[in-house]
């Protein structure tokens, strides 16, 4: 296969949700793809700080972080678009008025409240319930003692994303009414949980994973047709919709599967390594 730019979501795609160690078989496939002349990038909702441990692997040339708000390639920052302060303050207030718990993601830190931890603790007790990959990431992160700073430590650092958990979808109504023109409300229901919890994230309409991919293509002189995007959840749609070849993991959402060109084996079944072979990347 001609040289490609390969973009990989993390949770539920590259790794089982919430994990930080790349399986040996996957790492070998990544290294082999790089040796064959392909360039690999993380493409994730995680902020820069949460991608750093993975970026230390020499196989990655950069990353689309914060769902496109912060983009790196070969050590150079290509995109850096935090929320405007009044925008972040306003949407956060509209959510919190209805009891929605938020975590605030800056480039190098994540801030969250005690109540957010308590709500995820409830999910910890529901381990038998199948969760979407974003929910599982947070559940696992809390279980492992995720390094989250208290909201009281937040001093106005530029924010790239707000993650939320609501008791009911209707709790988001005011924020959507006021800010739907500025943010994409990327929501997922917490399957099999009778309390009606909804988790998700706010993505600034100024960017998305797709615009991050385009920024890297422009920087390196590639076209979108030269890209391959791997994802598993609805927040990967903006990535897979622009990729030359789009791949959804077998453990992914039904919505994403319908929009992608290919279905790879599950993240739990060496899906990346197997699909790299199927595509002729290795």
How would you label these PLM feature ranges?
Residues 2-19, 91, 240:
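Asp-based phosphoryl-transfer active-site loop
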Residues 21, 27-131:
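Active-site phosphate-binding/coordination module
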Residues 37-41, 59-61, 160-161, 225-226, ...:
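Short active-site oxyanion
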Residues 58-59, 67, 179-182, 242-243, ...:
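Short, structured coil segments at secondary-structure junctions
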Residues 60-67, 184-188, 246-251, 264-266:
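Short hydrophobic/aromatic-enriched beta-strand-loop microsegments
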Residues 109-228:
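Conserved acidic, metal-coordinating active-site core of Asp-based
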């Amino acid at each position: 296969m001609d040289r490609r730019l390969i973009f990989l979501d993390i949770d539920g795609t590259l790794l089982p949700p919430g994990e930080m160690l790349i399986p040996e078989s996957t790492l070998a496939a990544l290294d082999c793809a790089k040796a064959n002349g392909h360039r690999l990038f993380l493409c994730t909702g995680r902020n820069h700080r949460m991608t750093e441990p993975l970026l230390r692997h020499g196989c990655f040339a950069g990353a689309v972080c914060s769902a496109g708000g912060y983009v790196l390639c070969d050590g150079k920052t290509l995109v850096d678009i935090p929320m405007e302060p009044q925008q972040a303050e306003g949407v956060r207030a509209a959510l919190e008025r209805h009891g929605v718990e938020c975590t605030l993601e800056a480039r190098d830190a994540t801030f969250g409240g005690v109540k957010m931890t308590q709500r995820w603790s409830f999910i910890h007790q529901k381990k038998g319930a199948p969760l979407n990959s974003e929910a599982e990431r947070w559940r696992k992160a809390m279980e492992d003692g995720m390094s989250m700073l208290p909201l009281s430590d937040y001093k106005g650092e530029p924010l790239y994303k707000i993650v939320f958990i609501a008791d009911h979808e209707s709790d988001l109504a005011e924020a959507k009414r006021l800010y739907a023109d500025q943010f994409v409300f990327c929501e997922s229901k917490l399957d099999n949980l009778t309390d009606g919890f909804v988790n998700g994230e706010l993505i600034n309409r100024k960017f998305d994973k797709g615009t991050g991919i385009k920024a890297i293509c422009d920087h390196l002189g590639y076209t979108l047709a030269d890209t391959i995007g791997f994802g598993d959840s609805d927040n990967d749609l903006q990535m897979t919709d622009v990729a030359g070849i789009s791949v959804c993991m077998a453990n992914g959402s039904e919505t994403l599967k319908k929009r992608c060109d290919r279905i790879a084996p599950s993240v739990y079944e060496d899906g990346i390594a197997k699909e790299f072979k199927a595509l002729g990347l290795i």
